[in-house]
């Protein structure tokens, strides 16, 4: 399930984040330092050092925004969110086809985190750079994603994906992974559809008993499928 989440960051938050990143200096390092065995040969970008003060401040801003975003919570059903990371692609940089690693170590507590959902939060105006599309492959084909600054896309971490080469300008972004309460993408998609239906019914004069029944089905499925 691929879901676009608009305006995760408002203009003020976006400006604060870009101010931090644009003046991060030596905190920008070779992106291959965090790449796995298969990803390193095709990864050519820069990342903010996860241990830097710039990373900590930017992570706090993004995580605070996610906690207040109902669409993110509904679509992802987050259990554990990996601390957001930040990357930069300048002219000629790219990240070839790869699948994200299935398990990562949380940098703050060392615990293992299963990567169920991948997220990319766009931080650059799409008119400021050419190329840099996030291409995600699934059974329906190839989806090319290039969103407005502040918008985010989430998709199954099982997906083969790539960032196309930059031919002009600079693309700055935020990326991270989520261990969901529901590890199966099909089950998450079903619960997401049910939640959307419930929210629609809440805004109408739908039969209250029928609405309560649907809410009960949602929570009983969540209880049955949840890993926690």
Swiss-Prot record:
<keyword id="KW-0847">Vitamin C</keyword>
<dbReference type="InterPro" id="IPR006620">
    <property type="entry name" value="Pro_4_hyd_alph"/>
</dbReference>
<dbReference type="Pfam" id="PF13640">
    <property type="entry name" value="2OG-FeII_Oxy_3"/>
</dbReference>
<keyword id="KW-0223">Dioxygenase</keyword>
<feature type="binding site">
    <location>
        <position position="171"/>
    </location>
    <ligand>
        <name>2-oxoglutarate</name>
    </ligand>
</feature>
<dbReference type="GO" id="GO:0006974">
    <property type="term" value="P:DNA damage response"/>
</dbReference>
<keyword id="KW-0560">Oxidoreductase</keyword>
<protein>
    <recommendedName>
        <fullName>PKHD-type hydroxylase Rmet_3078</fullName>
        <ecNumber>1.14.11.-</ecNumber>
    </recommendedName>
</protein>
<keyword id="KW-0408">Iron</keyword>
<dbReference type="GO" id="GO:0006879">
    <property type="term" value="P:intracellular iron ion homeostasis"/>
</dbReference>
<feature type="binding site">
    <location>
        <position position="161"/>
    </location>
    <ligand>
        <name>Fe cation</name>
    </ligand>
</feature>
<dbReference type="Pfam" id="PF18331">
    <property type="entry name" value="PKHD_C"/>
</dbReference>
<dbReference type="GO" id="GO:0031418">
    <property type="term" value="F:L-ascorbic acid binding"/>
</dbReference>
<dbReference type="InterPro" id="IPR005123">
    <property type="entry name" value="Oxoglu/Fe-dep_dioxygenase_dom"/>
</dbReference>
<dbReference type="InterPro" id="IPR041097">
    <property type="entry name" value="PKHD_C"/>
</dbReference>
<feature type="domain" description="Fe2OG dioxygenase">
    <location>
        <begin position="80"/>
        <end position="180"/>
    </location>
</feature>
<feature type="binding site">
    <location>
        <position position="100"/>
    </location>
    <ligand>
        <name>Fe cation</name>
    </ligand>
</feature>
<dbReference type="GO" id="GO:0005506">
    <property type="term" value="F:iron ion binding"/>
</dbReference>
<dbReference type="InterPro" id="IPR023550">
    <property type="entry name" value="PKHD_hydroxylase"/>
</dbReference>
<keyword id="KW-0479">Metal-binding</keyword>
<dbReference type="InterPro" id="IPR044862">
    <property type="entry name" value="Pro_4_hyd_alph_FE2OG_OXY"/>
</dbReference>
<dbReference type="GO" id="GO:0016706">
    <property type="term" value="F:2-oxoglutarate-dependent dioxygenase activity"/>
</dbReference>
<feature type="binding site">
    <location>
        <position position="98"/>
    </location>
    <ligand>
        <name>Fe cation</name>
    </ligand>
</feature>
